[in-house]
C-alpha cells in the first residue's frame, strides 16, 4: 500500500525514518530515491547522509545543527516539491554480469552444510521454487533470469544490492 502521506519516525537522537508505503514497487522506491536526491541538492543544514530503501528513506542528521521538528518540516516541504514519480529523474547505470544458477560448487557447499549441520534442509533452489508456486528449480531460473533488475537499495553488507525486477512477473520471495 502507498500511504496517503509519508510517515516520520525518530530513530534515536539523530535519525529519521520516512516511510512512503509498505510494499515493494518502483514508485515507492523512486519517492525514496527522489527525496534523498532532493535533500542533497537542497544542501539541507545538518544533513549527514541518507539511506534509501524499497519504500523508505533513513535520514541521518546532526541534531546540533537542526532539530527533529525542523528536519521533518524540511522533509515534508521537499516531498511536496517532488511532484509525480513519473517526473522524478534518477541517475542510473546499466551493468551486465554473469549469474550462475544450479552450479556444482554451490550445490557442494549446500550438501556439506546439510551433511554437517542440517540434514533436513531442503535444497535452496527447490525451496524457493516451492515457496513461489513454481514447478521446479528450472522454472525458477527462467523466471529469475527473465528480467532486468533495479538496485533499490544497498544493504548493510558493503555493496550488497537489494534488487527489484523491472518486470513484476519476475518478483520472487
Language-model features, listed with the residues they occupy:
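Conserved "landmark" site that anchors the functional core of diverse proteins
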Residues: 1-173
Amino acid at each position: 500500500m502507498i500511504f496517503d502521506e509519508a510517515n516520520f519516525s525518530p530513530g534515536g537522537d539523530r535519525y529519521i525514518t520516512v516511510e512512503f508505503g509498505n510494499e515493494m514497487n518502483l514508485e515507492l522506491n523512486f519517492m525514496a530515491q527522489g527525496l534523498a536526491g532532493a535533500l542533497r541538492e537542497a544542501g539541507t543544514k545538518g544533513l549527514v547522509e541518507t539511506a534509501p530503501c524499497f519504500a523508505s528513506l533513513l535520514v541521518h542528521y546532526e541534531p546540533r545543527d537542526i532539530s527533529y521538528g525542523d528536519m521533518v518540516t524540511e522533509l515534508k516541504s521537499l516531498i511536496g516539491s517532488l511532484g509525480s514519480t513519473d517526473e522524478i529523474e534518477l541517475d542510473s547505470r546499466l551493468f551486465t554480469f554473469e549469474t550462475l544458477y544450479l552450479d556444482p560448487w554451490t550445490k557442494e557447499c549446500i550438501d556439506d552444510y546439510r551433511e554437517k549441520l542440517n540434514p533436513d534442509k531442503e535444497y535452496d533452489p527447490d525451496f524457493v521454487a516451492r515457496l513461489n508456486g513454481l514447478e521446479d528449480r528450472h522454472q525458477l531460473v527462467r523466471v529469475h533470469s527473465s528480467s532486468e533488475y533495479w538496485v533499490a537499495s544497498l544493504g548493510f553488507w558493503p555493496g550488497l544490492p537489494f534488487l527489484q525486477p523491472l518486470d513484476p512477473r519476475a518478483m520472487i520471495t
